C-alpha cells in the first residue's frame, strides 16, 4: 500500500492494472480475440468503444506489455485527445513517434484515448497519418461513442465494443484487492462501492482506496460518505414522494442531498435515471418521469441552475400525480 522508498501511498488503479490480457476483468470474448492478434504478432488498427472504466486502456497497455516485454514503454505512445485537441497533435507528436527508431520490432503502437474528442479536421489528419505509417505503426483508438469517429477511420480498424462491467465482476475484483491489502470490509460496503461505481472499475478501485484511508472497516456508511453518492433508498424516497403528489417532502429530500450531502445535480439525475425501472411505480408514471428527467438533464448541460431544474422536475411529477 505504501511505497517503501518514498513513503508514499501507491495509487491502486496503477498497482492493480492488468499485466496481461487474460487479467482484464469482464470481457473474456474481447480479450481472447485480442490475444490471438498478440500471439501472431499481427496487430491491426483497433478501435475500442465503450463507457469509462471498462478496460479499454487496460487492454491497450496489456497488448503493449505482451508484445514488447520490458521495452513496452519505448514502443508505446499514449496520448489523450481531450487534453491535446486539434490538428497539431496528429501532425507532430504522432508523426515524430512513428518516424523514430524501432529497436528491433516490426511496428510500434500509438494509443489515442478519448479519440472522439478530436475535431473532424484532426480525425481526417489522423486517417492520413494512419495510412502513411501503416507499415510500421499500429493505432489503438479509444472512445466513449464510436458514432463520433468518422467512417474512414472506423473502416480501417477492428472495432471492439466494451460493455459496462457487470456488478458481479466489479464486486469480485474489489474483494480480491481488499483481501490482498488486508482491508476489513463488509458485504454492504462492497455492494455500495459497486452501486457508486456504476460499472466503472477505475472509479470503484479509487473509491475503495479512499474508503480504506479512513482506517475503519469499509462499510456502506463510509462508502456513501466518501463517494458523495445518495443511497438508492434515498433516491426512491424522493421520487416516490413526488409521484405521490407530496412536493414539499420530495423537495426536502432533494435539499438534503444537495445542501447537506453536497451531491451535484447531474449525479442525482444519473441516479434517478438508472433506478427508475426499479421503483414500484406504474409504467405511465415512469415514462412521464423519464420525459421530465431528459428535459432537466439537457437544461443543466446547457448551463441552467441545477436546483431550479431539479425542483421543477419534482414539481412537474407531483402535479401530474394521480
From Swiss-Prot:
Amino acids binding ATP: 50-57
GO biological process: DNA repair; DNA-templated DNA replication
Alphabetized UniProt keyword annotations: ATP-binding, DNA replication, Nucleotide-binding
Name of this protein: Replication factor C small subunit
Family: Belongs to the activator 1 small subunits family. RfcS subfamily.
Its job: Part of the RFC clamp loader complex which loads the PCNA sliding clamp onto DNA.
Coiled-coil parts of chain: none
Organism: Halobacterium salinarum (strain ATCC 700922 / JCM 11081 / NRC-1)
Keyword ATP-binding included in the entry's annotation: yes
GO MF, any single term: ATP binding
Assembly: Heteromultimer composed of small subunits (RfcS) and large subunits (RfcL).
GO cellular component, one term: DNA replication factor C complex
Amino acid at each position: 500500500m505504501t511505497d517503501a522508498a518514498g513513503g508514499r501511498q501507491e495509487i491502486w488503479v496503477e498497482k492493480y492494472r492488468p499485466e496481461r490480457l487474460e487479467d482484464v476483468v469482464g470481457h473474456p470474448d474481447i480479450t481472447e480475440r485480442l490475444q490471438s492478434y498478440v500471439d501472431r504478432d499481427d496487430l491491426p488498427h483497433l478501435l475500442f468503444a465503450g463507457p469509462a472504466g471498462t478496460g479499454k486502456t487496460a487492454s491497450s497497455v496489456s497488448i503493449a506489455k505482451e508484445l514488447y516485454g520490458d521495452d513496452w514503454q519505448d514502443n508505446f505512445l499514449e496520448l489523450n485527445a481531450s487534453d491535446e485537441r486539434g490538428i497539431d497533435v496528429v501532425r507532430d507528436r504522432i508523426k515524430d513517434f512513428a518516424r523514430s527508431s524501432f529497436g528491433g520490432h516490426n511496428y510500434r503502437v500509438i494509443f489515442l484515448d478519448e479519440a472522439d474528442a478530436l475535431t473532424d479536421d484532426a480525425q481526417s489528419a489522423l486517417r492520413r497519418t494512419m495510412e502513411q505509417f501503416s507499415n510500421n505503426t499500429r493505432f489503438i483508438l479509444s472512445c466513449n461513442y464510436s458514432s463520433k469517429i468518422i467512417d474512414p477511420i472506423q473502416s480501417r480498424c477492428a472495432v471492439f465494443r466494451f460493455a459496462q462491467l457487470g456488478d458481479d465482476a466489479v464486486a469480485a475484483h474489489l474483494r480480491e484487492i481488499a483481501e490482498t491489502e488486508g482491508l476489513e470490509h463488509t458485504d454492504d460496503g462492497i455492494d455500495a462501492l459497486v452501486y457508486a461505481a456504476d460499472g466503472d472499475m477505475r472509479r470503484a478501485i479509487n473509491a475503495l482506496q479512499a474508503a480504506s484511508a479512513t482506517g475503519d472497516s469499509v462499510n456502506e456508511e463510509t462508502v456513501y460518505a466518501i463517494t458523495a453518492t445518495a443511497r438508492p433508498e434515498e433516491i426512491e424516497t424522493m421520487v416516490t414522494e413526488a409521484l405521490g403528489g407530496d412536493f414539499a417532502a420530495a423537495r426536502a429530500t432533494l435539499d438534503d442531498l444537495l445542501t447537506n450531502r453536497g451531491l451535484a445535480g447531474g449525479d442525482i439525475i444519473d441516479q434517478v435515471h438508472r433506478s427508475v425501472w426499479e421503483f414500484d411505480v406504474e409504467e405511465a408514471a415512469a415514462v412521464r418521469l423519464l420525459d421530465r428527467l431528459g428535459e432537466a438533464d439537457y437544461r443543466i448541460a446547457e448551463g441552467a441552475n441545477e436546483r431550479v431544474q431539479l425542483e421543477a422536475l419534482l414539481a412537474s411529477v407531483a402535479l401530474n400525480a394521480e
